[in-house]
């Protein structure tokens, strides 16, 4: 709660709006039970939820997530994927995710792209992208084959 309050005081000048936004993100990310716990004592998944809550305080139009699934257990990854999907469905926010874990990423996006040497190699829906030979070669190497 202290983190949310401190950041909101910087980015949201209006006290009433600040309080509304804090209450919204606390509710949205189910942080009620964690209000009295210092951030350094939170689990990895709880910290990810807090970071997303902090990012959404200012109601951004674009949210950039750099390797959000790194160092998380399977259950926490699933929870984070659900949060990302819900955010996409409930708001007009554009979420850009950069991650090396294709399986985790493709489970929660509408469109994905593979970059190689700063160039887009393939861009498509997740279901089409996994079938794309150029994407497979760029991601796995030329010697990778799916039978």
Task: Give the positions of each predicted feature.
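Q-loop/switch helix immediately C-terminal to the Walker
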Residues: 1-9
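Conserved ABC ATPase "signature" region
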Residues: 5, 16-34
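Conserved ABC ATPase signature
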Residues: 38-42
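Hydrophobic anchor residue at the start of the ABC signature
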Residues: 52
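Conserved catalytic motifs of ABC-family nucleotide-binding domains
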Residues: 59
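Catalytic Walker B motif of ABC-type/P-loop ATPase nucleotide-binding domains
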Residues: 63-67
